[in-house]
């Protein structure tokens, strides 16, 4: 039986011998280097514009470095194993010194920014965040340098539900699907049977149900199997301890809400208002995470 405790702390294969085995040896890009840059920015521009339209967001700028004392940097997980890069700014010969950190994530900053920018209910922000995560295992999915979208939406207490989470996830999925169609229109060579399109439907499944389906596999292998079967899935309830005694993955306690009780479609008690969109990567032949998101914690959760 495989070690089910493996990979609980997060991303990265952590075994380069294993990584070398699974990386494809015959991959060639469908686009030239120039076309790749044009296509990349076409996708980024399309997704940014349409996320703002669908979710009522405005684009803002997020800081690259923050004051340690501000408390707005993120630790990425709940065991403190991933620490940020920190450095001292003497600032006028140490008369006004600052101990600074490079951001690892903008989760806390975004919540503060909603208030700073005066966002009302149903309004939000989108930012293109750059960060350094020095303690990641580096592989074909993960880098120490992060360039990702971060967004935050102000919601009501009543909207803190699994139903609303799914509603937002489905809106985001439609944006991703339409971005796929748009870039294929610009670069028709991207539409090929070798690399099939993302499925139209995104399947929602709780981490507990994946454990039931693949009880002898560790987390990443479970994710790979379900992604291969479904093509695309939103796995929710990540962080709560499952029936085997382990969480699907450890998650920080001050990020998304993986504690709140929910109910499955067939009436079983579950936990968690967070999750990841995973797709089947036809190049690497394994799961690929597109986004991790969720309803934020409250003082109670």
PLM region spans:
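Active-site-proximal structural scaffolding
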Residues: 40, 44, 144, 165, ...
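Extended, charged alpha-beta segments that form solvent-exposed binding/catalytic grooves
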Residues: 122, 127-219
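Class II aminoacyl-tRNA synthetase-like tRNA-binding/catalytic domains
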Residues: 3, 7, 11-142, 150-154
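Short secondary-structure junctions and interdomain/linker hinges
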Residues: 50, 54, 58, 175-179, ...
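General structural signal for secondary-structure boundaries
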Residues: 66, 70, 104-105, 157, ...
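A translation/RNA-centric and nucleic-acid-associated enzymatic feature enriched
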Residues: 206-301
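Hydrophobic transmembrane alpha-helix bundles
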Residues: 93-111, 163-164, 168, 213-240
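NTP/phosphate- and nucleic-acid-binding module
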Residues: 1-4, 301
